[in-house]
Amino acid sequence: LGFLVSEDVLGPDGNSMGAFMRCDQGDKPVDHHTLNNIQLPGDNYPGPYGHSGYEVTDSVDDLMAGHYHMKTIDEYYHEWGVGRHLLGSQMYDYWRDTHGFTHEHWTDGDLLDASIPENKASFRDVVMAQYGPETPSTFGVTLPVDQIDKVRAEQPTLPDLIKEMEIAAKKGA
């Protein structure tokens, strides 16, 4: 399909569980990823549609203006952010619509050309940020907005879940 792997995502057991992929445009720099496929473990993460991302202009000010505008609209639920991803380095802000789908607004991400080789990254790196709040347990899961608070109260954050997975992988090794 003309994609290059930017990051091969490794699970706690060391096996690949997904990838961040970019379009191959030769020596022309392109966004760190256009497509991200991750197989999350367990029954709580069935792996359907995760989220759509929308680039705002090159301005952090525009991202923040959008954040505060979204807070004034009673139709959206804030999911995660504002922060900066480790992988791809973009600043992000995630919101849910009334149907429970997640939408990312982002800016200022890495640009890579075809000469940049594939990198190996841990699943922990996917959900961690250079700065920003911890990743909620509901991230990457499509569910009705009225269920989000209940799920978050019952389940750990994604970093907590990953820690449990890493401990289980060490015990099984």
Residue ranges of predicted features:
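Short amphipathic alpha-helical segments
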Residues: H33, P48-S52
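Short beta-strand micro-motifs in enzyme catalytic cores
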Residues: M17-A19, G50, M91-D93
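Intrinsic, low-complexity N-terminal interaction/targeting segments
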Residues: P29-N37
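Short, solvent-exposed aromatic-acidic interface loops
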Residues: L40-G42, G109-D110
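Vicinal oxygen chelate
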Residues: Y54-T102, T107-D113, D125-V127, Y131-A173
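Core segments of cupin and vicinal oxygen chelate
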Residues: L1-K28
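A short beta-turn/loop motif at secondary-structure boundaries
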Residues: G11-D13, N44, R84-G88
